[in-house]
Amino acid sequence: MAYSYTEKKRIRKDFSKLPDVMDVPYLLAIQLDSYREFLQAGATKEQFRDIGLHAAFKSVFPIISYSGNAALEYVGYRLGEPAFDVKECVLRGVTFAVPLRVKVRLIIFDRESSNKAIKDIKEQEVYMGEIPLMTENGTFIINGTERVIVSQLHRSPGVFFDHDRGKTHSSGKLLYSARIIPYRGSWLDFEFDPKDCVFVRIDRRRKLPASVLLRALGYSTEEILNAFYATNVFHIKGETLNLELVPQRLRGEVASIDIKDGSGKVIVEQGRRITARHINQLEKAGVSQLEVPFDYLIGRTIAKAIVHPATGEIIAECNTELTLDLLAKVAKAQVVRIETLYTNDIDCGPFISDTLKIDNTSNQLEALVEIYRMMRPGEPPTKEAAETLFGNLFFSAERYDLSAVGRMKFNRRIGRTEIEGPGVLSKEDIIDVLKTLVDIRNGKGIVDDIDHLGNRRVRCVGEMAENQFRVGLVRVERAVKERLSMAESEGLMPQDLINAKPVAAAIKEFFGSSQLSQFMDQNNPLSEITHKRRVSALGPGGLTRERAGFEVRDVHPTHYGRVCPIETPEGPNIGLINSLATYARTNKYGFLESPYRVVKDSLVTDEIVFLSAIEEADHVIAQASATLNEKGQLVDELVAVRHLNEFTVKAPEDVTLMDVSPKQVVSVAASLIPFLEHDDANRALMGSNMQRQAVPTLRADKPLVGTGMERNVARDSGVCVVARRGGVIDSVDASRVVVRVADDEVETGEAGVDIYNLTKYTRSNQNTCINQRPLVSKGDVVARGDILADGPSTDMGELALGQNMRVAFMPWNGFNFEDSICLSERVVQEDRFTTIHIQELTCVARDTKLGPEEITADIPNVGEAALNKLDEAGIVYVGAEVQAGDILVGKVTPKGETQLTPEEKLLRAIFGEKASDVKDTSLRVPTGTKGTVIDVQVFTRDGVERDSRALSIEKMQLDQIRKDLNEEFRIVEGATFERLRAALVGAKAEGGPALKKGTEITDDYLDGLERGQWFKLRMADDALNEQLEKAQAYISDRRQLLDDKFEDKKRKLQQGDDLAPGVLKIVKVYLAIKRRIQPGDKMAGRHGNKGVVSVIMPVEDMPHDANGTPVDIVLNPLGVPSRMNVGQILETHLGLAAKGLGEKINRMLEEQRKVAELRKFLHEIYNEIGGREENLDELGDNEILALAKNLRGGVPMATPVFDGAKEREIKAMLKLADLPESGQMRLFDGRTGNQFERPTTVGYMYMLKLNHLVDDKMHARSTGSYSLVTQQPLGGKAQFGGQRFGEMEVWALEAYGAAYTLQEMLTVKSDDVNGRTKMYKNIVDGDHRMEAGMPESFNVLIKEIRSLGIDIELETE
């Protein structure tokens, strides 16, 4: 394989044994593809597909007026250009969106003409609000903050059959039910009651017999019975009764008479039970009629009304039970034929027949009225109202839609072959659902499993945005209908009809405040990717935490390869929020699919198919780790497989599919845990969750022991700068990389220059620091997709969340009791876990009633010292080191005339000066914060004069833009002249500056000319003259284009900012805060092994080995056995080997060994011990040296999940590094110098510092705010609250009998208002006595008792 620019600089030793059949897909595809389909940007009218915005418009338009004389049709739409780019939107706090313009056609019909002749057509583009655009990383910028729309896992539309698990009725009888769930519209439920009658509910309302619904559909009793039951036909001839025999129906019955064949031979004797053997004999004998006694009919139900043959009078209605009296009537009337329903107790129950018996309605109208009463109780029903309501419930496309998914699921479930059909229900649909439900009750068929991923589908961003958009359009439709009637009389245009506000509001509400639109988790690249790949069962139309039971949250067999069984939050959301598996994707219906390799006759092919949970059920699927021979055939006698959602073993020839990779089961975060297969699942869950909380360290350090997924995550997360096209690095500095694109990738007529501006020290959503560092040097050749610059938490294009630390597992003076972590001071000195946090502080100057607030350095009653960090505009300068309480932005607010104190009156009388009428409301650094000002932004309202600071910032930005554009022009110009030089040198000239006719042009001549003079050359070859003219035109066009671009940017910068009403100016100050690691910070490994730093010890006190190398971290060995995450120990061993090999390479370099020796040693590491072989021969000697230099700190290794390093390979690596194979060594106590009793496990573990820092949690209250009602101090750091002295603490003081302490706690330290004021004064005066008064909460108690109407008085003694 060819190595990329960064890969060949540091190759990871890969221990995987299984071949890569399929690359890991682009990890953000689920977000980007979904929204791309929603927008269909750039599609022409013909190319529009029936999805997304287009589908929403088509479903609402055409809108026809109430009179029918005017219609508004939809023609198409187009999206404009965004006003600001992503970075500008974040800075200005606006939404990154594009205007949507819709072309509509207003048609007015001629009233007079009978055939609706068209009188007038008007077409116009109408502005329909802004649609947020997705950034290239799958996020949205809404009001300046980066947000993610999480996909939702909801119940698929369709029909579901279920039972109550015996919980409803005391007997434990299973009551079956069916539910038709549409994509939008009313739910329809059918359910059995304990008496085996079928009922129907619409939208979970009161239940009605199911036959009421069937009657409302227009079915008569007889048609209903015919639909559900077969009939037995009896012929009466005089005194004999003959049954038309269907032998199968006799099965299981007891013969009431001898059953004989045609020859009189008895087949079944009277009193015997009829078996399958008897039925076979009857069929063979061809018995078609059976004589039965008359009482055989008693208790049977009539299927067709019995009519008197002579008079036509109805003797018995259908669905009546035959009794002796009825039989007598029938005999008297000489009826010759009776049809009865065929029912039995085993597989054909009389459920529908029984339901009809309890149904009070007898015709369609009564049934409709009954339904109307149930839906609209209390309203008087009319025939029209009842018909309209019923028609709109399930049969109107506007109110009801199953959607393509729903129709597909519906048809499949009730056994139809076609999967397409209308979105509304039909009579047949309802009958088929009832038939299936009755069949399930009869024991034919099974109920559905609602947690099966074939019954749950994923709604992605695009679909949810489309639904919201449709909601907005429906609101618009109502208003348009009203106005359409006026359109013709008043000559209105489409623009006057459509008010786009409801659409814009619906979209804004969805992106701004929907439960699934979340503030992006931006701690590190992994947390960004995981957030975008999250699938939530919560949200609108989903579950709620309280209602979700255990089953929904549990891991289901169909999760395999679709949803990660490990990664889910701990706490109330466990199992409701999941993460997509690595290779999973959604199909066109929204069901999750997983890829498999096709297996034919036990030969594994390279063909890959994606299957949903339903499609895979019938397949026999082998695991990715199944043993294959060289030809790719399965060799084991029995292969471990999945079949029908069960894990079993089968013969190789039965296998039809095979997993593509062992990591297809888990999510991205879980696949980053090395030796995951050796960790307990609970700890792996914590491990994958805690990696998302790692704070990017100052210097990222790649993991020595990784899994090989690190590069994919870093590349796909979008935090790195990836080359869009290949080429040569033209120039590079800390803030930009300029690439001159290779000729074969340049499109005609464009510059062939890619400028990548790097993000420097920017604040993330979690206040961590986003900073990019270039990896390339001038002159380097890069290919498309190579990584040009590292972002936060990435090291040479690999994800690097933490640091490799030398750890020892041993108890140490109790400092690592209960998961505490003991650190060496060296870790702090080397800034291994130092992180930078950036805080944004905002100062807003408003227009108040008393006058405008002013941002100024002239602040009353503030000394010089406090102002020495401000410039003349009153804003802190960049680079200032500030402490808590320092002024960042000086601001004064006018205050009203106040009563003057006597002193002020005196001063005013003496000096005659008016005391300042403004108060100081400056922005100060919050308590507990100190840092460096790294950036200041000033936003000024239109029409408000800009201060000097705003102008200098603007000038800086313009200079930067100008520099960019000049650079681009310089390269374009250079490239053009290079091409010209190649063409001109050696060609003959007709004339030119200081040139004779017919002279050959040389390099020296061209070098002596100014570039502008080149175009004055006249060449003998006309083609060259044409080339010169084209080049001149191209360069001047380019110059003009870049000047226009500059003017455009300049206009944007100089226009006033769109600020909230009443705001004149906003100043944003960005503080960079450096946080070193300290006791109280939380740290963790990748295996769920978390702990809190308890102590930082001097280096000389830490345990060290025989060479004198001290360890960095001492961990408690008791944290491993009970938690069963042994992966951390294996990681430690392999990490030791990796580091040892690095040191060995380092020694070879220092001894300046030959390259051949280095190559040989590298070959031993990469190709002789297990795993994948690396092709080191394709690297030149210089590249081998560069690789060796990068491996000095340790040889990075990859042990992919479920396919990682084996124990023997770890031992071989340790041996190669000249280290003990046990991974243990003798340590010495740094304090005493004595050797410890036993060998200790020492090695390198990858440790993370989590975003739970003691600085953010530590808090102490002096005097602060009090709660309004109880007058007690508030709680929590955000409110500057106190420590709660709760019920249990009171018990403790009571137990000690500490009466005075208790009194102080309950009064002056809490809510005795007068007492605490007096106490404060006393302490100021140096008097430490206290007088306790009445606590405010006691007054509250009295008031509450009085509110109950109880008169209560306090008596004074």
Curated annotation (Swiss-Prot):
GO terms for molecular function: DNA binding; DNA-directed RNA polymerase activity; ribonucleoside binding. GO terms for cellular component: DNA-directed RNA polymerase complex. Pfam families: RNA_pol_Rpb2_1 (PF04563), RNA_pol_Rpb2_2 (PF04561), RNA_pol_Rpb2_3 (PF04565), RNA_pol_Rpb2_45 (PF10385), RNA_pol_Rpb2_6 (PF00562), RNA_pol_Rpb2_7 (PF04560). The keyword Calcium does not apply. It comes from the Bacteria. It catalyses: RNA(n) + a ribonucleoside 5'-triphosphate = RNA(n+1) + diphosphate. DNA-dependent RNA polymerase catalyzes the transcription of DNA into RNA using the four ribonucleoside triphosphates as substrates. This is DNA-directed RNA polymerase subunit beta.
